[in-house]
Amino acid sequence: MSDSKSSASTSEDRLYGSAPSHDVPKRKTRTHHLQAMKAEGERWAMLTAYDYSSARIFEEAGIPVLLVGDSAANVVYGYETTVPVTIDELLPLVRGVVRGAPHALVVADLPFGSYESSPEQALASATRFMKEGLAHAVKLEGGERVAPQIAAITAAGIPVMAHVGFTPQSVNSLGGFRVQGRGDAAEQLVADAIAVQEAGAFSVVMEMVPAEIAGQVTRKLTIPTVGIGAGVECDAQVLVWQDMAGYTSGKTAKFVKRFGNVGDELRSAAAAYATEVRAGTFPAEEHSF
């Protein structure tokens, strides 16, 4: 590198901060790695991510799988449910996450209305996320009813993560946020999980499912199960990162554990910044050129 290029790089680092160093050797996470981890009894964590900066942090924390969820409808765009969010709204988020976490397996949610009509519609939507979003896999909700869609997508060489139990896109038809798979419904949940595996899914999310049933499904399937409100026997767990880190305020679901208080920290930092600006103490001499 020439002295001029080195000097320019140093100047940019001073202005904007240098890129993070990745001291720990990492491999690119792929679907067969997750399959091997299930075989070895090794659990793994998945988080949602919606931008470059959070994805970078989660990769540094050792999270192997990141989901650009349609939950962006709630935490990014402020919709009340996941139903309104579109492919065009999700694609830029996927691209940012892929760039921020080059070693993670990045899964993109197919939003409501983008796959239900036919296998052809599902494949077209999944292809957009792979070509335009650079995602590594897609996720869609439903069991037996979407098995043809899963089969069509996987036949085209696109990995699919399935999602059974409570499916947020169907919140209106399910009568609200309710635990699924209780009583007589347990048999259908098991059938749904088997159907998505047979259709070619590489893993399946189980949301708001009784822990006992989720454990039975996990033992029955050869693909990894990912729990969210489905007990500890699943092969992996997933949470929305804003819930996990305490970024969101107000009441959270029973299955959420807050591992931090990011919201309080950010609020305090913003308030301190505003106070110093009003007082004329920021920027100080050391922050000026």
Curated annotation (Swiss-Prot):
Pathway: Cofactor biosynthesis; (R)-pantothenate biosynthesis; (R)-pantoate from 3-methyl-2-oxobutanoate: step 1/2. SUPFAM superfamilies: Phosphoenolpyruvate/pyruvate domain. The keyword Oxidoreductase does not apply. It catalyses: 3-methyl-2-oxobutanoate + (6R)-5,10-methylene-5,6,7,8-tetrahydrofolate + H2O = 2-dehydropantoate + (6S)-5,6,7,8-tetrahydrofolate. Keywords: Cytoplasm, Magnesium, Metal-binding, Pantothenate biosynthesis, Transferase. The keyword Acyltransferase does not apply. It is found in: Cytoplasm. InterPro entries: Pantoate_hydroxy_MeTrfase (IPR003700), Pyrv/PenolPyrv_kinase-like_dom (IPR015813), Pyrv_kinase-like_dom_sf (IPR040442). 3-methyl-2-oxobutanoate binds at D70, S71, D109, K139. One of its GO terms (biological process) is pantothenate biosynthetic process. CDD domains: KPHMT-like. Mg(2+) binds at D70, D109, E141. This is 3-methyl-2-oxobutanoate hydroxymethyltransferase. The gene is panB.
